[in-house]
Design a protein with these regions (language model features):
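Residue-level signal for short amphipathic helical patches enriched in basic/charged
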Residues: 20, 35, 50
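A short, conserved structural fragment
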Residues: 48-58
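Mature soluble domains of exported/periplasmic/lumenal proteins and thiol-rich metal-chelating peptides
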Residues: 24-27, 57-61
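Short alpha-helical segments that sit at the start of domains
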Residues: 1-14, 60-62, 67
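Short amphipathic alpha-helical interaction segments
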Residues: 35-46
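Short amphipathic alpha-helical interface segments
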Residues: 6-32
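Alpha-helix N-cap/helix-initiation sites
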Residues: 3-6, 22-23, 37, 55
């Protein structure tokens, strides 16, 4: 895993969120992007660091929204 790969995962997650009008759970992102859970979380971290997503804990999952 390197920075370039994580950036590609972040692009896939961002595109999925954008296509879904900005909101998904981690479970939904895994299903939509076909990424593994650790890859989805790495991508979310990348996007959060760039200020592009909000992350909210909802019961046993995490919801991610575009800003």
């Amino acid at each position: 895993m390197n920075v370039e790969t994580i950036g590609l995962w972040a692009g896939a997650v961002w595109n999925a969120l954008n296509d879904a009008n900005g909101s998904f759970t981690v479970k939904g992102l895994k299903k939509t992007t076909k990424l593994k859970e650790k890859e989805v979380f790495a991508a979310i971290g990348w996007l959060a660091r760039e200020g592009k997503v909000n992350v909210t804990e909802i019961e046993k999952d995490v919801e991610v929204n575009l800003i």
